[in-house]
Amino acid sequence: MWKYKYQSKNYFVKRAKQVEIAEKVRTIHRQLGRMDPSLILPLVQSDDEQLIVQMWQEGSHGANFAHKKDRKESLRLLIALHDTHKKIAWQRVPGLHTYSQLLKWQMRHMRFKSRRNELRTFLTKEEIDQILHYSDKSLQLIALEDAPEKEITLLHGDVVHHNFLWCSDGQLRLIDFDLAHLGEADDEYILWLHRVLPAVDYDLGKIFAELPELKRLDKRKLHRLKYPNELLREWLFAIDLPLEQQLVFLDYLVPFTKRALTYWPKLWYDIDRFVKK
Protein backbone atom coordinates (compact mmCIF):
# COMPACT_ATOMS: atom_id res chain seq x y z
CA MET A 1 0.00 0.00 0.00
CA TRP A 2 1.36 3.42 -0.88
CA LYS A 3 0.36 7.11 -0.95
CA TYR A 4 -0.48 8.55 -4.38
CA LYS A 5 -1.27 12.16 -5.29
CA TYR A 6 -3.57 12.91 -8.23
CA GLN A 7 -5.04 16.32 -9.09
CA SER A 8 -4.23 17.76 -5.64
CA LYS A 9 -5.86 14.83 -3.79
CA ASN A 10 -4.06 12.04 -1.93
CA TYR A 11 -5.06 8.39 -2.06
CA PHE A 12 -4.24 5.02 -0.50
CA VAL A 13 -3.34 2.71 -3.38
CA LYS A 14 -2.70 -1.03 -3.29
CA ARG A 15 -2.23 -3.46 -6.17
CA ALA A 16 -3.91 -6.81 -5.52
CA LYS A 17 -1.89 -9.90 -6.43
CA GLN A 18 -4.70 -11.12 -8.67
CA VAL A 19 -7.71 -9.57 -10.39
CA GLU A 20 -9.92 -12.07 -8.53
CA ILE A 21 -8.70 -10.75 -5.18
CA ALA A 22 -9.38 -7.15 -6.21
CA GLU A 23 -12.88 -8.11 -7.34
CA LYS A 24 -13.50 -9.89 -4.02
CA VAL A 25 -12.41 -6.76 -2.13
CA ARG A 26 -14.70 -4.57 -4.24
CA THR A 27 -17.62 -6.95 -3.68
CA ILE A 28 -17.07 -6.89 0.09
CA HIS A 29 -16.92 -3.09 0.08
CA ARG A 30 -20.16 -2.86 -1.91
CA GLN A 31 -21.89 -5.02 0.69
CA LEU A 32 -20.36 -3.32 3.74
CA GLY A 33 -20.95 0.13 2.24
CA ARG A 34 -24.62 -0.30 3.15
CA MET A 35 -23.82 -0.62 6.85
CA ASP A 36 -24.24 2.29 9.25
CA PRO A 37 -22.04 3.24 11.01
CA SER A 38 -19.38 2.57 8.39
CA LEU A 39 -16.89 -0.21 9.18
CA ILE A 40 -14.69 0.52 6.17
CA LEU A 41 -13.13 3.24 4.02
CA PRO A 42 -15.09 3.53 0.75
CA LEU A 43 -13.30 2.59 -2.46
CA VAL A 44 -12.55 5.12 -5.20
CA GLN A 45 -13.20 3.93 -8.74
CA SER A 46 -10.11 3.01 -10.77
CA ASP A 47 -9.59 2.11 -14.43
CA ASP A 48 -7.03 -0.51 -13.37
CA GLU A 49 -9.04 -3.51 -12.19
CA GLN A 50 -6.19 -4.75 -9.98
CA LEU A 51 -5.89 -1.50 -8.04
CA ILE A 52 -7.65 -0.88 -4.73
CA VAL A 53 -7.94 2.89 -4.21
CA GLN A 54 -9.23 4.78 -1.15
CA MET A 55 -9.06 8.41 -0.01
CA TRP A 56 -5.94 9.21 2.00
CA GLN A 57 -6.68 9.84 5.68
CA GLU A 58 -4.56 12.73 6.90
CA GLY A 59 -3.23 12.08 10.40
CA SER A 60 -4.40 8.47 10.33
CA HIS A 61 -2.58 5.69 12.16
CA GLY A 62 -2.97 2.02 12.94
CA ALA A 63 -4.26 0.70 16.24
CA ASN A 64 -1.83 0.06 19.07
CA PHE A 65 -2.80 -3.06 21.00
CA ALA A 66 -0.77 -1.86 23.99
CA HIS A 67 -3.52 0.75 24.51
CA LYS A 68 -6.72 -0.35 26.24
CA LYS A 69 -8.89 1.91 24.05
CA ASP A 70 -7.47 0.38 20.88
CA ARG A 71 -8.03 -3.16 22.14
CA LYS A 72 -11.62 -2.35 23.05
CA GLU A 73 -12.43 -0.50 19.81
CA SER A 74 -10.75 -3.05 17.53
CA LEU A 75 -12.72 -5.89 19.14
CA ARG A 76 -15.92 -3.84 18.88
CA LEU A 77 -15.22 -3.31 15.18
CA LEU A 78 -14.56 -7.02 14.59
CA ILE A 79 -17.79 -7.97 16.35
CA ALA A 80 -19.69 -5.48 14.18
CA LEU A 81 -18.11 -7.01 11.07
CA HIS A 82 -19.01 -10.54 12.12
CA ASP A 83 -22.56 -9.53 13.02
CA THR A 84 -23.19 -8.37 9.45
CA HIS A 85 -24.26 -11.95 8.67
CA LYS A 86 -27.62 -10.94 10.17
CA LYS A 87 -28.16 -8.59 7.21
CA ILE A 88 -25.88 -9.95 4.47
CA ALA A 89 -25.99 -13.51 3.12
CA TRP A 90 -22.21 -13.82 2.86
CA GLN A 91 -22.36 -17.47 1.79
CA ARG A 92 -24.10 -16.37 -1.41
CA VAL A 93 -21.45 -13.76 -2.24
CA PRO A 94 -19.16 -14.98 -5.06
CA GLY A 95 -15.44 -15.26 -4.40
CA LEU A 96 -15.72 -16.02 -0.68
CA HIS A 97 -14.73 -19.45 0.64
CA THR A 98 -14.12 -21.24 3.94
CA TYR A 99 -10.85 -22.86 5.00
CA SER A 100 -9.66 -24.97 7.91
CA GLN A 101 -7.69 -23.08 10.54
CA LEU A 102 -6.45 -26.40 11.94
CA LEU A 103 -5.15 -27.56 8.55
CA LYS A 104 -3.38 -24.24 7.95
CA TRP A 105 -1.71 -24.46 11.36
CA GLN A 106 -0.70 -28.08 10.82
CA MET A 107 0.98 -27.07 7.56
CA ARG A 108 2.74 -24.16 9.29
CA HIS A 109 4.00 -26.52 12.00
CA MET A 110 5.38 -28.92 9.39
CA ARG A 111 7.09 -26.12 7.45
CA PHE A 112 8.77 -24.85 10.61
CA LYS A 113 9.86 -28.36 11.54
CA SER A 114 11.29 -29.00 8.07
CA ARG A 115 13.47 -25.88 8.36
CA ARG A 116 14.74 -26.38 11.88
CA ASN A 117 18.36 -26.76 10.70
CA GLU A 118 18.23 -23.33 9.03
CA LEU A 119 16.60 -21.85 12.12
CA ARG A 120 19.51 -23.04 14.26
CA THR A 121 21.44 -20.05 12.85
CA PHE A 122 19.19 -17.77 14.89
CA LEU A 123 17.64 -19.86 17.68
CA THR A 124 19.03 -22.36 20.16
CA LYS A 125 18.11 -26.03 19.88
CA GLU A 126 16.14 -25.67 23.12
CA GLU A 127 14.11 -22.74 21.77
CA ILE A 128 13.26 -24.60 18.55
CA ASP A 129 12.31 -27.70 20.54
CA GLN A 130 10.08 -25.59 22.80
CA ILE A 131 8.26 -23.99 19.88
CA LEU A 132 7.72 -27.37 18.21
CA HIS A 133 6.58 -28.95 21.49
CA TYR A 134 3.96 -26.26 22.17
CA SER A 135 2.87 -26.37 18.54
CA ASP A 136 2.52 -30.15 18.39
CA LYS A 137 0.71 -30.50 21.73
CA SER A 138 -1.71 -27.66 21.00
CA LEU A 139 -2.57 -29.09 17.57
CA GLN A 140 -3.43 -32.39 19.25
CA LEU A 141 -5.78 -30.56 21.63
CA ILE A 142 -7.38 -28.55 18.82
CA ALA A 143 -8.05 -31.74 16.86
CA LEU A 144 -10.00 -33.05 19.87
CA GLU A 145 -12.23 -29.95 20.14
CA ASP A 146 -15.89 -30.70 20.72
CA ALA A 147 -17.42 -27.29 20.05
CA PRO A 148 -20.76 -26.96 18.25
CA GLU A 149 -20.72 -25.22 14.89
CA LYS A 150 -21.69 -21.55 14.83
CA GLU A 151 -23.05 -19.23 12.15
CA ILE A 152 -20.77 -18.71 9.14
CA THR A 153 -19.93 -15.06 8.52
CA LEU A 154 -17.38 -12.80 6.87
CA LEU A 155 -13.92 -12.87 8.48
CA HIS A 156 -11.42 -10.10 7.76
CA GLY A 157 -8.56 -12.58 7.51
CA ASP A 158 -5.65 -10.42 8.73
CA VAL A 159 -6.27 -8.77 12.10
CA VAL A 160 -2.80 -7.25 12.46
CA HIS A 161 -2.85 -3.88 14.27
CA HIS A 162 -2.26 -1.71 11.18
CA ASN A 163 -5.40 -3.06 9.46
CA PHE A 164 -7.42 -1.26 12.14
CA LEU A 165 -7.05 2.35 11.00
CA TRP A 166 -7.83 5.42 13.08
CA CYS A 167 -9.19 7.73 10.37
CA SER A 168 -9.25 11.52 10.02
CA ASP A 169 -12.72 11.71 11.59
CA GLY A 170 -11.54 9.89 14.72
CA GLN A 171 -13.30 6.63 13.85
CA LEU A 172 -11.64 3.21 13.71
CA ARG A 173 -12.18 1.33 10.45
CA LEU A 174 -10.99 -1.89 8.85
CA ILE A 175 -8.78 -1.83 5.77
CA ASP A 176 -7.09 -4.43 3.54
CA PHE A 177 -9.61 -7.21 2.89
CA ASP A 178 -7.33 -9.21 0.56
CA LEU A 179 -7.40 -12.27 2.84
CA ALA A 180 -11.10 -12.06 3.72
CA HIS A 181 -12.95 -15.38 3.74
CA LEU A 182 -15.88 -17.17 5.36
CA GLY A 183 -15.78 -18.86 8.74
CA GLU A 184 -16.91 -18.80 12.35
CA ALA A 185 -16.37 -15.54 14.22
CA ASP A 186 -14.67 -17.41 17.10
CA ASP A 187 -11.78 -18.34 14.80
CA GLU A 188 -11.04 -14.67 14.17
CA TYR A 189 -11.35 -13.72 17.84
CA ILE A 190 -8.67 -16.33 18.51
CA LEU A 191 -6.41 -14.79 15.85
CA TRP A 192 -7.07 -11.32 17.30
CA LEU A 193 -6.08 -12.59 20.76
CA HIS A 194 -2.87 -14.04 19.30
CA ARG A 195 -2.04 -10.51 18.12
CA VAL A 196 -3.10 -8.76 21.33
CA LEU A 197 -1.62 -11.03 24.02
CA PRO A 198 2.05 -10.04 23.45
CA ALA A 199 1.05 -6.40 24.09
CA VAL A 200 -0.31 -7.27 27.57
CA ASP A 201 2.41 -9.69 28.68
CA TYR A 202 0.21 -12.66 27.70
CA ASP A 203 -2.15 -11.82 30.59
CA LEU A 204 -5.31 -13.67 29.56
CA GLY A 205 -7.11 -12.73 32.78
CA LYS A 206 -6.55 -9.04 32.12
CA ILE A 207 -7.96 -9.25 28.58
CA PHE A 208 -11.09 -11.14 29.64
CA ALA A 209 -11.66 -8.79 32.58
CA GLU A 210 -11.47 -5.63 30.47
CA LEU A 211 -13.41 -7.06 27.50
CA PRO A 212 -16.60 -8.82 28.65
CA GLU A 213 -17.56 -9.06 24.95
CA LEU A 214 -15.18 -12.02 24.74
CA LYS A 215 -17.78 -14.09 26.59
CA ARG A 216 -19.22 -14.81 23.14
CA LEU A 217 -16.07 -16.86 22.39
CA ASP A 218 -16.61 -20.58 23.03
CA LYS A 219 -14.20 -21.53 25.84
CA ARG A 220 -13.57 -24.88 24.20
CA LYS A 221 -11.65 -23.03 21.50
CA LEU A 222 -9.26 -21.36 23.94
CA HIS A 223 -6.80 -24.23 23.46
CA ARG A 224 -6.03 -22.55 20.12
CA LEU A 225 -4.21 -19.84 22.06
CA LYS A 226 -1.64 -22.45 23.11
CA TYR A 227 -0.50 -22.72 19.50
CA PRO A 228 2.54 -20.41 19.03
CA ASN A 229 1.11 -18.91 15.86
CA GLU A 230 2.99 -15.62 15.95
CA LEU A 231 6.35 -17.33 16.42
CA LEU A 232 5.86 -19.89 13.66
CA ARG A 233 4.53 -17.37 11.16
CA GLU A 234 7.15 -14.70 11.83
CA TRP A 235 10.09 -17.10 11.69
CA LEU A 236 8.89 -18.66 8.44
CA PHE A 237 8.63 -15.13 7.06
CA ALA A 238 12.01 -14.01 8.41
CA ILE A 239 14.01 -16.96 7.15
CA ASP A 240 13.29 -16.09 3.50
CA LEU A 241 13.98 -12.35 3.70
CA PRO A 242 16.95 -10.80 1.86
CA LEU A 243 19.91 -10.51 4.24
CA GLU A 244 19.68 -6.76 4.93
CA GLN A 245 15.96 -6.91 5.69
CA GLN A 246 16.45 -10.09 7.69
CA LEU A 247 19.03 -8.49 9.99
CA VAL A 248 16.69 -5.59 10.75
CA PHE A 249 13.72 -7.90 11.38
CA LEU A 250 15.75 -10.20 13.62
CA ASP A 251 16.50 -7.28 15.94
CA TYR A 252 12.79 -7.40 16.74
CA LEU A 253 12.04 -11.12 16.34
CA VAL A 254 14.79 -12.70 18.47
CA PRO A 255 13.91 -10.82 21.70
CA PHE A 256 10.18 -11.19 20.89
CA THR A 257 10.67 -14.97 20.72
CA LYS A 258 12.71 -15.24 23.91
CA ARG A 259 10.14 -13.14 25.76
CA ALA A 260 7.19 -15.17 24.43
CA LEU A 261 8.75 -18.46 25.46
CA THR A 262 9.20 -17.25 29.04
CA TYR A 263 5.45 -16.53 29.25
CA TRP A 264 4.20 -19.67 27.48
CA PRO A 265 4.08 -22.07 30.48
CA LYS A 266 1.92 -19.61 32.47
CA LEU A 267 -0.26 -18.89 29.43
CA TRP A 268 -0.82 -22.64 29.03
CA TYR A 269 -1.82 -22.89 32.71
CA ASP A 270 -4.13 -19.85 32.48
CA ILE A 271 -5.88 -21.25 29.42
CA ASP A 272 -6.57 -24.56 31.21
CA ARG A 273 -7.98 -22.60 34.15
CA PHE A 274 -10.28 -20.54 31.91
CA VAL A 275 -11.53 -23.60 30.03
CA LYS A 276 -12.52 -25.26 33.32
CA LYS A 277 -14.33 -22.18 34.71
Region spans (language model):
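Active-site acidic catalytic loop and adjacent metal/ATP-binding pocket
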Residues: 1-8, 139-187
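ATP-binding pocket architecture of kinase catalytic cores
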Residues: 6-90
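Conserved aromatic-histidine-acidic binding/catalytic patches
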Residues: 17, 66-69, 151, 219, ...
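A glycine-centered beta->alpha junction motif in the catalytic cores
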Residues: 51-65, 87, 108-118, 232-243
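Long, hydrophobic, amphipathic alpha-helical segments used as structural scaffolds
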Residues: 85-93, 142, 146, 239-243
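An alpha-helical support segment within catalytic cores of ATP-dependent transferases
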Residues: 108-156, 263-277
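Active-site activation/catalytic loop segments of kinase-like enzymes and analogous catalytic loops
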Residues: 186-243, 247-263
